[in-house]
Amino acid sequence: MEFTKTNNGFVKYDENGKVIAEITYSNTSNPNVVIADHTIVDSSLRGQGVAGKLLDALVKDMHEQNKKIKASCSYVVKKFQEDSSFDFINAEK
């Protein structure tokens, strides 16, 4: 699944240009840390691992920029707590 990179995250559009999946982040006072603050997936895509793929895209992008992620949205908080493979990018580890 392909996502479009935006100024503050990644999105998936449907054929009409409507956002059907999105993960966003905001910058912090520390230029090496961003806050993952919002993840949403349209009900038509739920159960397909789309939120995880969005998070993977964000993690890859931030890793390439040598930045860490602080989890704020409930989905990312849960993933960071449950999966230690994210420890390398987790700003709170």
Regions found by a protein language model. Give the residues of each.
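A short, internal acetyl-CoA/4′-phosphopantetheine-binding micro-motif in the GNAT/acyltransferase core
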Residues: 39-46
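C-terminal structural segments of small proteins and small subunits
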Residues: 61-93
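Active-site rim helix/loop that mediates acceptor-substrate recognition in acyltransferases
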Residues: 1-10
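A conserved beta-turn-beta hairpin within the catalytic core of GNAT-like acetyltransferases
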Residues: 28-36, 68
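Conserved beta-hairpin
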Residues: 9-20
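Conserved acetyl-CoA-binding loop-helix of GNAT-fold acetyltransferases
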Residues: 47-58
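Conserved beta-strand in the GNAT
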Residues: 18-26, 35
